[in-house]
């Protein structure tokens, strides 16, 4: 049993906890503690009721020191609530924590991870790309087999790298990629404003519900971290759109082979049924973004939108639930880290 603590109980932290139960991994993962500065009643309420993902299928209750996840047989899981703002104060040793899922979005370098380990955790997994000094960055399904026992402090990448990197790998393995560009069409996030208000990024001073808003992205750097051979070969831009969840990615790549649309799509289908089963999915149904809400895959390719120009310029539309898919990959990576120890 992997004993897990969640540091940061925001969008990803709460989705990770739900995913432990909804993905059927509760028999392998036990969440023993959550560290969050918010009040226990708000933590429990937002775990039970979620605007994007609906009501949690488990009954949730709480007191000032615990969240309780109730099972139908009358038993319940008790999760310790902590409200500590500094990592060295966290009682991971006393709680017997094996692995910390750091979902704060604040911490992400080797020193931060080492503080978790010094506090008693054995392993640390960050929920964002993190610094280059981490032991490894894992995009599950692509490079998780590179994990070793020496990799104690790891990043799970970002939701967008988890979406696009598996597709890049499939295309490169099959056809060879020369270069590419990506446009991320991302749902609004909590670093945006409800109405116009001050922000360091002037575009993010504007109301999230009223505009399509360009934002900076380092997605191309995330691709290079996983595939060093693509250094300076990919560029990316990102826009935020007035939806609360689900992201679309417009991928264009130049390839070394001459292909047709069916060649590209069939390659994705094959991967989704074999090497990337559960990670990549494929559809030709006439779906829209809401239809991918709460989808656990990292990437879903809409085959009806695949285009090929002059045999070697390939354009694809790839969907992901940027919260739920990523939360499920956090758990997959956590178990993969445990398996190396």
Swiss-Prot record:
CDD domains: GAPDH_C_E4PDH (cd23937). The record marks 186 as: Activates thiol group during catalysis. It holds the Pfam family Gp_dh_N. GO terms for cellular component: cytosol. The keyword Oxidoreductase applies. The keyword Oxidoreductase applies. Keywords: Cytoplasm, NAD, Oxidoreductase, Pyridoxine biosynthesis. Substrate binds at residues 158-160, 204, 217-218, 240. SUPFAM superfamilies: Glyceraldehyde-3-phosphate dehydrogenase-like, C-terminal domain (SSF55347), NAD(P)-binding Rossmann-fold domains (SSF51735). The active site is at 159 (nucleophile). It is found in: Cytoplasm. NAD(+) binds at residues 11-12, 322. Pathway: Cofactor biosynthesis; pyridoxine 5'-phosphate biosynthesis; pyridoxine 5'-phosphate from D-erythrose 4-phosphate: step 1/5. It catalyses: D-erythrose 4-phosphate + NAD(+) + H2O = 4-phospho-D-erythronate + NADH + 2 H(+). GO terms for molecular function: erythrose-4-phosphate dehydrogenase activity; glyceraldehyde-3-phosphate dehydrogenase (NAD+) (phosphorylating) activity; NAD binding. One of its GO terms (biological process) is pyridoxine biosynthetic process. Its main location: cytoplasm. Homotetramer. Belongs to the glyceraldehyde-3-phosphate dehydrogenase family. Epd subfamily. Catalyzes the NAD-dependent conversion of D-erythrose 4-phosphate to 4-phosphoerythronate. This is D-erythrose-4-phosphate dehydrogenase. It comes from Vibrio cholerae serotype O1 (strain ATCC 39315 / El Tor Inaba N16961). The lineage of its organism: Bacteria, Pseudomonadati, Pseudomonadota, Gammaproteobacteria, Vibrionales.
